[in-house]
């Protein structure tokens, strides 16, 4: 590992953020710290992850939602101090890494099938 990668790993460890495992197709709720004047509040942004970029400290992901009939996409830096928390609401079953095709779809064709836990995981959960 070179020096830059080592420094990035140390910085990620120092930030001490708990980021859940999520993938494209998952529905997530991103809590964002918003500063308005002298007030600071937390705003929830819920949508489908359409892209994920894994670059160590520079990692990011794009979340798409439909707001009052209009598609809205927002790109977040994974380790940004503006992100208060990330919560995975629903797992999506997709076969692509980038779901940009959802931009051209609306209604039922834009739905993503839910990924159900496999039978092996269910057996392990009941045994424990």
UniProtKB/Swiss-Prot annotation:
GO terms for biological process: translation. This is Large ribosomal subunit protein bL19. Belongs to the bacterial ribosomal protein bL19 family. PANTHER family: LARGE RIBOSOMAL SUBUNIT PROTEIN BL19M, RIBOSOMAL PROTEIN L19. GO terms for cellular component: cytosolic large ribosomal subunit. This protein is located at the 30S-50S ribosomal subunit interface and may play a role in the structure and function of the aminoacyl-tRNA binding site. One of its GO terms (molecular function) is structural constituent of ribosome. The keyword Transmembrane helix does not apply. The lineage of its organism: Bacteria, Pseudomonadati, Pseudomonadota, Betaproteobacteria, Burkholderiales. The keyword Repeat does not apply. PROSITE patterns: RIBOSOMAL_L19. InterPro entries: Ribosomal_bL19, Ribosomal_bL19_CS, Ribosomal_bL19_sf, Translation_prot_SH3-like_sf. It holds the Pfam family Ribosomal_L19. Keywords: Ribonucleoprotein, Ribosomal protein.
